[in-house]
From Swiss-Prot:
Name this polypeptide is given: Hydrogenase maturation factor HypA
Family note: Belongs to the HypA/HybF family.
NCBIfam families, alphabetized: hypA
Keywords attached to this entry: Metal-binding, Nickel, Zinc
The gene coding this protein: hypA
Species, as recorded: Alkalilimnicola ehrlichii (strain ATCC BAA-1101 / DSM 17681 / MLHE-1)
Lineage: Bacteria, Pseudomonadati, Pseudomonadota, Gammaproteobacteria, Chromatiales
GO biological process: protein maturation; protein modification process
InterPro entries: HypA/HybF
Length: 113
């Protein structure tokens, strides 16, 4: 489950930002997760709760905003929505798609004390 290591990385960022911005508690973490990022959302929620125990983010609420996958089709030259990597272009059927969005995972914002 790579979501656990993702959550550990998020916690590390939270701790660094707490030192830099001088806050002591995290109430809410909002993430943007692309549909093509390969993240299992249920595992992410679980991992976040486990990793954050006894830290500045203990009990923090995790909110995830999922971003749609987007690709550029080399076959027809269109920007298209895709739900999974290696899907065919919904317009022309080509498999020559280059992902241009929806593969990110980033902290959008925090609520802190």
């Amino acid at each position: 489950m790579h979501e656990m290591s993702l959550c550990e990385g998020i916690l590390q960022i939270l701790e660094e930002e707490a030192r830099r911005q001088m806050f002591s508690r995290v109430r809410t973490v909002r993430l943007e997760v692309g549909e093509l990022a390969g993240v299992e959302l249920d595992a992410m929620y679980f991992g976040f709760d486990v990793v954050c125990r006894d830290t500045l983010a203990d009990g923090a609420r995790l909110e995830i905003v999922q971003r749609p996958g987007q690709a550029f089709c080399l076959g027809c030259g269109e920007r298209v929505a895709v739900r999974r990597r290696f899907d065919a272009c919904p317009d022309c059927g080509s498999y020559q798609l280059q992902v241009i969005g929806g593969d990110e995972l980033r902290i959008k914002d925090l609520e802190v004390d």
